[in-house]
Amino acid sequence: MLSPCLAAPATECRDPADAPAAPARHTGPARPRKRRPRNWKPHLPRERLLERGPAALTDAELIALLLGTGGGGRDVFASARALLARFGDSLRDMLDAEPDVFATHPGIGTARSAVLIAVTEIVRRALVEKARERLQIDSPGAVEDYLRLRIGTRPHEVFVTLYLDARHGLIDVEESARGSLTRMAVYPREIVRRALVLNAAALIIAHNHPSGAVQPSAEDRRLTRVLHEALALIDAKLLDHVVVGTADTFSFARAGWL
């Protein structure tokens, strides 16, 4: 007598043990699949930045990403290269440029100029913050580097005061006055009053010369003398007056004028 399996068609008498295993089912939450946009072009700066990091891009390509489009029918990469070339291919010189320079460059315009100005200001503030964290008052070079970074490229005169404690630790940094290209109103009594409020034992004052020249004027020397004498009345000391240019500084203390 034949077994039912032998009598049945081959497809119906297959041993269950020989049947292929059913694929395992994923019972957990669906796993997200990384999908690239349909217009993904791995050779373009944006895509290379996302895949390989910003170090993979040239200076001009980074600028092109900020510009977004070239404007006025211009190629964005050509606009970025031309803008960088205007500053001798120097990102530092570009960051130090006057804000209105960007808007007047062909293909940039107001909107793109605003983006560039915002980025340069973000970079400047980050560098100032980092320099302040590392600032050592007992190191004249570090103080001058900090001041040059903070006010060296300002288009107008700015007066800055560093208030220090008895151990020359930094209490606060304040911009006490701002002025025109050639004139600025500084009130010693306000600086002395602020020193009393902060209980400061010593001060360093500084201002910039937008012209770039750091030679002190007669008015600079007079202000230094008046403030030095006023601070002495409250037992506080003026440690230095630093005149800041775009690339250099002048220290009253180093010159022996304090």
UniProtKB/Swiss-Prot annotation:
Zn(2+) binds at residues 207, 209, 220. Coiled coil: none annotated. InterPro entries: MPN, RadC_JAB, UPF0758, UPF0758_CS, UPF0758_N. Keywords: Hydrolase, Metal-binding, Metalloprotease, Protease, Zinc. GO terms for molecular function: metal ion binding; metallopeptidase activity. A motif (JAMM motif) lies at residues 207-220. It comes from Burkholderia ambifaria (strain ATCC BAA-244 / DSM 16087 / CCUG 44356 / LMG 19182 / AMMD). This is UPF0758 protein Bamb_2548. One of its GO terms (biological process) is proteolysis. Residues 136-258 form the MPN domain.
